[in-house]
Structures are given as C-alpha cells and as structure tokens.
Amino acid sequence: MAGHSKWANTKYRKERADHKRGKIFSRTIKELISAVKMGGPDPKTNARLRVIIQKAKDQNIPSENIERNLKKASSADQKNFEDVTYELYGYGGVGIIVEAMTDNKNRTASDMRIAVNKRGGSLVEPGSVLYNFSRKGACYVPKNSIDEAALLSHVIEVGAEDLDNDDEEHFVVLCDPVDLSSVKEQLVALGVTCTEEKLIYVPLRVVDCDEKDGEANLALIEWLEKIDDVDEVYHNMA
C-alpha cells in the first residue's frame, strides 16, 4: 500500500497520516472546482458536482468552505484542474508513482524536478514503473468502527478481493475498479462506515532494499508528498 514500509517508523507514519488528511480535503475541493467548470454550479443539473458536494460533507468539510469554493469555481479567473501522473525510480530499484491534480502542469513538473534534484531518484518515461502495479478500487473503513473479523466477513459477502491492514487508521477493502461503487454501496447497506473510496495502485511485487536505500527512499517520498499539487504517492518498497 502507499507509504507502507518497514523503514517507516511510528513518528513518520503519524506525520504522514496527519498530512494525508489535509491532502484528502484539498483533493475534494479541487474536484469540486473541476466539476463546476465542466458542468456548471447547480448541483440539481450537475450530477458529478452533486456527488462531490456529498463527498465533501461526508468528510466534514464546513459548508462555508464548500460555498466559498463553489463561487470561486464560477469565476473566469479560476483555472480548471487536471490529473497528471509521474513515474520515478528511487534507490535500490524501488518504483514510485505520483498522482497529482493541478491547474498548472508546468509548475507541478518543475516541483517534481526539484524533488529529484534534492532527494535523488530519476523521473522516467510513462509505463516504466506502472507495469509493476495493479489498479484497484479501495474503500477506507476506520479501524475504530468495526472488528477486523466482522469486516472480513462482509468483504467476502460483497465479493471484494482483499482486506488490507497496513494503513495506520483504516482497513482498506480492495476490489476491481469497475466494482468500486457497488462494493461501497453494499458495505454501507451492511452498516459499514466507508469514509473514502477511490482508485489506487497496489504493487504486484515488492523490492527489498537495505537500510540506507530505504531511508533515502522515505526522504524522497516525504518530499514528494509535501508538493502542494500531489495527492498520492505509491511505491513498491518492502
């Protein structure tokens, strides 16, 4: 799973979890702005916007923040956001995938080059790293909301593929991307709390590197995660 490694200590994982929460809110706001740009500011006639507004409410984003960004999105000065993906090789042959949502691709590309210049690794051509990963749907279930054995029973019942326990705060229910909406709806119908659902990358194989390379990779990943436009960083380091 993204960010999980034997070289990541408790302090690193706690800081990453706190940082990730902010990234989730930021991503939702960018999705909201993009939905308005594509389909207009009225959720009654813009189904995509309606879904994202509900998503924002589920994430406890304040209503005033939602309204402010709806107005912001309607401004001609506000650029639209687009998804971009970067692939890198870190130390010891570790593959890294970076997903970002940006209103300025040149700025984001520059930030990526700075990260590599400062922390090492190399940016590579599209497809050079992706073949080591599989695209999966993921539903995030708070660990304090359900017992793992009970959730596993539900996972089997709804036909999901796997249950991942690596995340610090959530169980992650994995499924085929095309089944994500259905799996989430079935879990919710069974009383399971799903705080987030999205598509993620899961490594097909992991790379075991030494402590020096492991720590260097974590430093690179931490730098990448702090880039404003970056939403998620995936790697295949053991």
UniProtKB/Swiss-Prot annotation:
Keywords: Cytoplasm, DNA-binding, Transcription, Transcription regulation. It is found in: Cytoplasm. One of its GO terms (molecular function) is DNA binding. It comes from Chlamydia felis (strain Fe/C-56) (Chlamydophila felis). One of its GO terms (cellular component) is cytosol. GO terms for biological process: regulation of DNA-templated transcription. It holds the Pfam family TACO1_YebC_N. It comes from the Bacteria. Belongs to the TACO1 family. This is Probable transcriptional regulatory protein CF0838. PANTHER family: TRANSCRIPTIONAL REGULATORY PROTEIN YEBC-RELATED (PTHR12532:SF6), TRANSLATIONAL ACTIVATOR OF CYTOCHROME C OXIDASE 1 (PTHR12532). InterPro entries: Integrase-like_N (IPR017856), TACO1_YebC-like_2nd/3rd_dom (IPR048300), TACO1_YebC_N (IPR049083), Transcrip_reg_TACO1-like (IPR002876), Transcrip_reg_TACO1-like_dom3 (IPR026564), YebC-like (IPR029072).
